[in-house]
Amino acid sequence: MKFVFEQIRTGGDRNFAYVLGDREAGVAALIDPSYDPEAVVERAKAQGLETAYIVNTHGHEDHTNGNAQAKKLTDAPIVAFRGSVAKPDFPVDDGHVLQLGSLHLELIHVPGHIDDHIVVYLEEQRVALTGDHLFVGKIGGTQTEDAARTQYVSLQKILDRLPDDITVWPGHDYGCRPSSTMALEKATNPFLLAMGSVDEFLALKRDWATFKAEKGLK
């Protein structure tokens, strides 16, 4: 098996899509092929891969607006968390493992930013596609304190589940680099540094604009 991995800038709000594939099996999964689904499909084809799945990390429009066109071009099913607003053809539950040739894509439910969010984790390849759950140096926004509390629990779940050497590939290019590692995020991401208690985490969420200004962050 030869692992195929591509990060693709698709436009929108600095969105990333991804192509994951097994070259020997000739199959690929497209992750969040929004804004420019044609380009994402073509990248899979250029690698000699047939698209078997279209996976949404979550149901926000900026991650799903390419679904219809990607499905039209590939006839692949939409995969998302059960009950997702993305209305998946193939709904999954927490911990479902999607088989893609010899690749195993573990889908980890991480509600908070939105209830249907999942992280796509490939343990053998040391890769996690974190969508809007975890960015480089930041995390996804929340609309309510209840959602922020849920997000805190989900972040702890990821901290417990993903080892330090896992590469983090986010859904947007919001950080100082397009990818990171769990070790680097634990050491530098302000929100992960505030995971000592939920109160500390919530305080940073509330004061994030001030914190950014004081630290000169964008």
Regions found by a protein language model. Give the residues of each.
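Accessory terminal helices/loops
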Residues: V153-K218
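Glycine-rich, phosphate-binding/catalytic loops in enzymes
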Residues: Q47, K71-L73, D146-A147, E185-T188, ...
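A generic "cationic amphipathic patch" detector
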Residues: P33, Y53, T57, N67, ...
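Short, polar loop motifs at secondary-structure junctions
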Residues: I78-A86
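Active-site metal-binding motif and surrounding structural segment of the metallo-beta-lactamase
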Residues: P37-V79
